[in-house]
Amino acid sequence: MHIIQNTITILNNFVDISGVEVGQHLYWQIGNFEVHGQVLLTSWFVLAVLLGLAVLTVRDPQTIPTGQQNFAEYLLEFIRDLARTQIGEEEYISWVPFIGTLFLFIFVSNWSGALVPWGVVKLPHGELAAPTNDINTTVALALLTSVAYFYAGLAKKGLSFFGKYIQPTPILLPINILEDFTKPLSLSFRLFGNILADELVVAVLVSLVPLVVPIPVMLLGLFTSGIQALIFATLAAAYIGESLENHH
């Protein structure tokens, strides 16, 4: 009973974390729910960019790829190699779409914060920023990773998947349970903190010094944004691979 109460407390903490606010927000009332409108707007923008690039890439496929198709195939190979390395040769192929979607969404979201002049768009309330600049987005991505983790383990092993919680000794049961719920929490905090800090540093420098001075910081932000997307996707794949591996 104590373990169940701890688990419920952790889930409630996720809900509390999603209420953390940085800056001003535009709220939409949907039924009995209040949602962050600017997060949905920027997320839809990112999805539109990804869908647009996908359509441009596949509309005229060639036997010998060139240009956009060549880049898309290289990107696919990169994601497949990442999934193969972290998940394993036998299981990785079915998880390539999930890992690829995570990586591309986070990557484009992060870059949109540095490349898209969100401040030009004026809202009645709040301000636009990268989707990953809002902890609601990062917590949602982390929870998706957690759901994928349990789905992968249960789909392969059934209820025997839960046997790993009493290995190597039943005494570690509470710690093993907490570990699985704190993994996505660390993922969301890492991504949210890095993207928010990067945008705040650039905003402060732009307000204090001429535009040319913050450019090196912006370039560094683009690099670290890509690294953060890679780290998130790699750790998500590693967690899924961990749930699929055999425990003896």
From Swiss-Prot:
One of its GO terms (cellular component) is proton-transporting ATP synthase complex. InterPro entries: ATP_syn_F0_a_bact/chloroplast, ATP_synth_F0_asu, ATP_synth_F0_asu_AS, F0_ATP_A_sf. Its main location: plastid. CDD domains: ATP-synt_Fo_a_6. Keywords: ATP synthesis, CF(0), Chloroplast, Hydrogen ion transport, Ion transport, Membrane, Plastid, Thylakoid, Transmembrane, Transmembrane helix, Transport. The chain crosses the membrane at residues 38-58, 96-116, 135-155, 200-220, 221-241. GO terms for molecular function: proton-transporting ATP synthase activity, rotational mechanism. It is found in: Plastid, Chloroplast thylakoid membrane. It is a multi-pass membrane protein. HAMAP family: ATP_synth_a_bact. Belongs to the ATPase A chain family. Key component of the proton channel; it plays a direct role in the translocation of protons across the membrane. F-type ATPases have 2 components, CF(1) - the catalytic core - and CF(0) - the membrane proton channel. CF(1) has five subunits: alpha(3), beta(3), gamma(1), delta(1), epsilon(1). CF(0) has four main subunits: a, b, b' and c. This is ATP synthase subunit a, chloroplastic.
